[in-house]
Design a protein with these regions (language model features):
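WD40 beta-propeller blade core
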Residues: 19, 70, 109-110, 150, ...
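C-terminal closing repeat unit and adjoining cap/tail of repeat-based domains
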Residues: 144-188, 195-196
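Structural signature of WD-repeat beta-propellers
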Residues: 6, 13-14, 64-65, 103-104, ...
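Loop/turn-rich, solvent-exposed surfaces of beta-rich toroidal or solenoidal domains
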Residues: 98-113, 117-151
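Extracytoplasmic beta-rich repeat domains
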Residues: 1-6, 28-55, 79-95, 119-137, ...
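Short loop/turn segments that connect beta-strands within beta-propeller blades
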Residues: 22-26, 73-77, 112-115, 153-157, ...
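N-terminal leader/targeting helix
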Residues: 63, 68-69, 76-108
C-alpha cells in the first residue's frame, strides 16, 4: 500500500525498491534499495517490499521478503541511513525510539531506529505466522494464526500479556487505536483489545 507524507507518495515495488513519487505529478523523486535480489533461481531472487513503509519524522523504513529492513532519510534525497538482513513477509512499525519488525520465521525484533542495532529479540513465537507489529503506550502487539494477540514490552521484548480472539487466524495487521489494538480475524470478528 502506498504511504503519503509531506509532498511524496512512497511505494514499495518488486525487486526490493522503495520509490518516492511527487504527489503533484507522480514523477519519481528518489529510489532506495531495500533489498538486492540474489540467488540461483527466480524464486530465490524474489525480494519484494511486501508491507507499507513506516514513517517517523524524516525517517522512512521498509522491509522486503528475502531481503532486509532499511531506513532512509527523506530530507537527504532518500539517503540510506542503515540496513539489516532481516526478511519479513508481514511488516514493521516505528515509534519515537524503536523500529519493530517480525521476520518470516516469527521472530520479533526491537531495533534502534537511528542505527539499526539490536536492542532485543523475541524468538518464542517461531512458526506461528506472526503479523506485523503495532506499537502503542509501551506495548508491541503481534497476532498469530491461532487467533492470539501477544503483547510484548517495548523496552525488552518480554511477554506482557496474551489475549485470545475467536480462535481463527488473524490475517490482517494489528492496528493501534485509542488505548488498545484493533484486530480482525478470518472468522469475521473485529475486536478492540487492550493488554490485561
Amino acid at each position: 500500500s502506498p504511504v503519503f507524507a509531506d509532498r511524496y507518495v512512497f511505494v514499495g515495488y518488486p525487486g526490493g525498491k522503495l520509490v518516492a513519487l511527487a504527489i503533484q505529478n507522480g514523477a519519481p523523486v528518489w529510489e532506495g534499495a531495500v533489498a538486492l535480489p540474489k540467488g540461483a533461481t527466480e524464486l530465490d531472487r524474489v525480494a519484494d517490499v511486501v508491507a507499507p513503509p513506516a514513517i517517523d519524522g524524516r525517517l522512512i523504513c521498509a522491509v522486503a521478503f528475502q531481503g532486509r529492513v532499511a531506513c532512509f532519510d527523506m530530507g537527504q534525497g532518500g539517503a540510506l541511513i542503515w540496513a539489516r538482513d532481516i526478511s519479513s513477509a508481514s511488516g514493521l512499525a516505528l515509534d519515537g525510539r524503536y523500529l519493530f519488525v517480525t521476520d518470516d520465521k516469527g521472530v520479533v525484533y526491537g531495533l534502534d531506529r537511528l542505527s539499526g542495532s539490536s536492542l532485543w529479540k523475541q524468538d518464542k513465537l517461531l512458526n506461528r505466522r506472526i503479523s506485523a507489529p503495532a506499537v502503542r503506550r509501551g506495548n508491541v502487539a503481534v497476532a498469530d494464526a491461532q487467533g492470539i494477540v501477544h503483547f510484548l514490552s517495548r523496552e525488552d521484548g518480554s511477554f506482557v500479556a496474551r489475549q485470545k480472539t475467536d480462535g481463527t487466524p488473524v490475517r490482517t495487521s494489528v492496528q493501534p487505536l485509542g488505548s488498545g489494538f484493533l484486530v480482525q480475524t478470518s472468522g469475521g470478528n473485529v475486536s478492540l483489545i487492550e493488554p490485561q
